[in-house]
Amino acid sequence: MPTIQQLIREERKAAVRKTKAPALKGCPQRRGVCTRVYTTTPKKPNSALRKVARVRLTSGFEVTAYIPGIGHNLQEHSVVMIRGGRVKDLPGVRYHIIRGTLDAAGVKDRKQGRSKYGAKRPKPGQAPAAAGKKK
């Protein structure tokens, strides 16, 4: 604990907060162009092929972004929108691609949590896709 004299001599410094998504430069989203689309494996104890893309942003950064949802239409030179948000089991992946905007199509046949995957509301007259539903 500092003395009053020490506080007069040197005031308290506020802790500097470090951003978790520096490539966004304080913006909620950023546009970018995919330079490489590939799959990678998560760290232990998980096992899968996670879909990720290397994206060159308008802010000048090149980052690795996760492609959420089942299936995607992204390839090299696709224009995408990214947001912050890391993937816990993929080291170095601190951004998510926003589905349903620009060249990233929404997830097909998505019934629940549609807004997170850019899926439109299904028409009420269509046949139900979930055949395993019980009464």
UniProtKB/Swiss-Prot annotation:
GO terms for molecular function: rRNA binding; structural constituent of ribosome; tRNA binding. One of its GO terms (cellular component) is small ribosomal subunit. Residues 124-135 have a biased composition (Low complexity). It comes from the Bacteria. This is Small ribosomal subunit protein uS12. Part of the 30S ribosomal subunit. Contacts proteins S8 and S17. May interact with IF1 in the 30S initiation complex. The keyword tRNA-binding applies. The lineage of its organism: Bacteria, Bacillati, Cyanobacteriota, Cyanophyceae, Synechococcales. Keywords: Methylation, Ribonucleoprotein, Ribosomal protein, RNA-binding, rRNA-binding, tRNA-binding. The modification 3-methylthioaspartic acid is found at D89. Residues 113-123 have a biased composition (Basic residues). GO terms for biological process: translation. With S4 and S5 plays an important role in translational accuracy. Belongs to the universal ribosomal protein uS12 family. Residues 106-135 are annotated as: Disordered.
